[in-house]
Amino acid sequence: MQSVNQLKIDRLACQRGDKILFTDLSFNLQSGDFVQIEGHNGIGKTSLLRILAGLAQPLSGKVRWNSEEISKCREEYYYDLLYLGHHAGIKPELTAWENLKFYQQAGHCRQGDEILWNVLEKVGLLGREDIVASQLSAGQQKRIALARLWISQAPLWILDEPFNAIDKNGVKVLTGLFEQQAEKGGIVILTSHQEVPSSALTVLNLAQYKFTDNE
């Protein structure tokens, strides 16, 4: 990882349909930051993460990665980014092994088959690696998606509800992984409906930036 990376959010506003969700949202993140985006349902947490990941456009404002607008450095930005959304984002026609191999070869990842075997064991898919993803349960498909976390060397992780359908021990394991990512100089941004058991976490509440009619 680069010694210092910075994600700068400058006066973002977000609109969904006819509704403005938030306005004038600004903050800076740098290597070592571990942040939870908090707020009630419908306030715009997922919309914000999609904007930060370059998958949606803000109503106004800029997102910069290492001082450059992400729209102008897409190739570099996507190489440096691991984004996990609500959906597993895997290829249903590929096996668990093939999905991880595809991701490993295409992304900013640790290389080698031994890495994949270790990760499959870690997420409980060893023995199911040759099953086509479409034949696996929704929970098992999510494990394929989460397995990318142990493979990725991307410095920026943006994760939408990574703890959904994960038991208490799994939450603890994932939280430890997120802390390690930050300690290594990465940046982790996530949303969660449950408490994140980490003293290293910084919380940003979107309610502070909620649009009101008298603004």
Swiss-Prot record:
GO terms for biological process: cytochrome complex assembly. It catalyses: heme b(in) + ATP + H2O = heme b(out) + ADP + phosphate + H(+). It comes from the Bacteria. Its main location: membrane. Keywords: ATP-binding, Cell inner membrane, Cell membrane, Cytochrome c-type biogenesis, Membrane, Nucleotide-binding, Translocase, Transport. GO terms for molecular function: ABC-type heme transporter activity; ATP binding; ATP hydrolysis activity. The keyword 4Fe-4S does not apply. ATP binds at residues 39-46. This is Cytochrome c biogenesis ATP-binding export protein CcmA. The lineage of its organism: Bacteria, Pseudomonadati, Pseudomonadota, Gammaproteobacteria, Pasteurellales. It is found in: Cell inner membrane. InterPro entries: AAA+_ATPase (IPR003593), ABC_transporter-like_ATP-bd (IPR003439), ABC_transporter-like_CS (IPR017871), ABC_transptr_haem_export_CcmA (IPR005895), P-loop_NTPase (IPR027417). It is a peripheral membrane protein. Pfam families: ABC_tran.
